[in-house]
């Protein structure tokens, strides 16, 4: 089974790190990267092509 590719976008570092830590414990999820604002999220989404983007 192919892993779900996730990008995390949040302006709070501790939230990004916490979500990433939780998601990395799941075998079927791959955290592609993190973004600290909307512009960075758009840039990374275009470059990394995630299946899911978690944003606040």
Range-by-range predicted roles:
Residues 27-28, 37, 50:
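Short, conserved catalytic or interaction motifs in soluble domains
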Residues 10, 56:
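Active-site residues of response regulator receiver
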Residues 11-12, 38:
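Generic detector of well-ordered alpha-helical packing
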